Amino acid sequence: MKRRKWLNGLATLAAACLVLAACGGNSGNNGASPSASESSPSASAPSSSGSASPSAIGGDTVKVGILHSLSGTMAISEVSVRDSELLAIEEINAKGGVLGKQIEPIVEDGASDWPTFAEKARKLISEDKVATVFGGWTSASRKAMLPVFEELNGLLWYPVQYEGMESSPNIFYTGATTNQQIVPAVDYLLENGKKKFYLLGSDYVFPQTANKIIKEQLKAKGGELVGEEYTQLGHTDYSTIIAKIQAAQPDVVFNTLNGDSNVAFFKQLKDAGITSADLTTLSVSIAEEEARGIGPEYLEGHLVAWNYYQTTDTPENKTFVESYKAKYGADRVTADPIEAGYVAVYLWAAAVEKAGSFEVDKVKEAAAGIEFAAPEGKVTIDGENQHIYKTVRIGELQADGQIKELWNSGEPVKPDPYLKTYDWAAGLSSGS
């Protein structure tokens, strides 16, 4: 009965975030203070073999890993996801923890380096004996970690939209898959008269796979590809590419650049005299946090596709935004991956309570069908592929760095990571 009451309360806990944030300074040993989060706990914790399991539990605490890029080119995006995950942990701890245990976060820096992500994931599972890990941003980091989680039977909660064509039994995907972001974004552009596409992305798996999908979609729906370019993460000179874009005269640049390359691209685009009135860009890795880093004056009028904005109108989001700002500062913003990281912690906690166990296999089994009243709206874990149902939203960046929603899907969209429901995508993957 006690567990049932906790589960019922979990779905509405986000609505109490303001109160919890206000008392956060008085919540003693919750292990989630930002200052404490930068270093791992003492290595004196007992070491035993095996993956995330009851060995993660010590006394009155259960250890979880948080693994994001806190340095390097991806830090512009990932630091704030870490912060939202720590906020969720603090809130859950203030409510009594999970199965009566306080959550103890162990934070590691992936340093925008994919082998480092794999190394740190192995450390968290094998040495720290964490029950689960919340982490990653780029698909390169996720794919580096994936074999480690599968080998050691660990559990990763990955909070960022990605290219699909994957469904690991050891990963829960709380960001959008392709049919919840990229495919509807292309449809939206085509339906609004944008037929000629220029594809610009960072040179790694997410942009490459996303653009492969987009090209098939354009062929099937009467669009036209007029250019395609890739640059390394951290690339800063876009003058040549901007000249190529001007020569190609596209209706839209579909932008899959990631990290601080977006700062250089949009500043140089404006320096070339090109504004959103001259050329539409639609980005899938720029949200409010990136707008804050780039400068909204460079982004005003450009489009984005996500599942959540700080302006999303739900009671849960109002509370989430207020709590996040109360903890981290009034100048901070929320954004889609920030919210997805926050939601991931709550979904894991709900699955643990439903399972009555921290063991990975039991948590995975219990997670299927769990619903949560998230800041973005209702989300549900799809037991078939461990992705979540999400509402699609197309938005326009405003002068203050916020995003005005222009369109949404009306209801949460079932995740289809292999695009099995799209005839034109039949040749893209043999995934099932």
Mark where each language-model region is:
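Extracytoplasmic "Venus flytrap"
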Residues: 54-58, 62-84, 108-115, 137-140, ...
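Extracellular/periplasmic bilobed ligand-binding domains
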Residues: 211-305
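An alpha-beta-alpha
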Residues: 70, 171-233, 252, 348
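Extracellular/periplasmic periplasmic-binding protein-like sensory domains
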Residues: 269-342, 353-358, 408-431
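Solvent-exposed, acidic/polar segments of extracytosolic/periplasmic ligand-binding ectodomains
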Residues: 52, 374-432
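Periplasmic-binding protein-like
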Residues: 124-136, 157-159, 198-201, 249-259, ...
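Bacterial lipoprotein signal-peptidase II cleavage site
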Residues: 20-35, 41
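Beta-alpha junction/loop-to-helix N-cap segments that form part of ligand/metal-binding clefts
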Residues: 76-83, 95-165, 174, 231-238
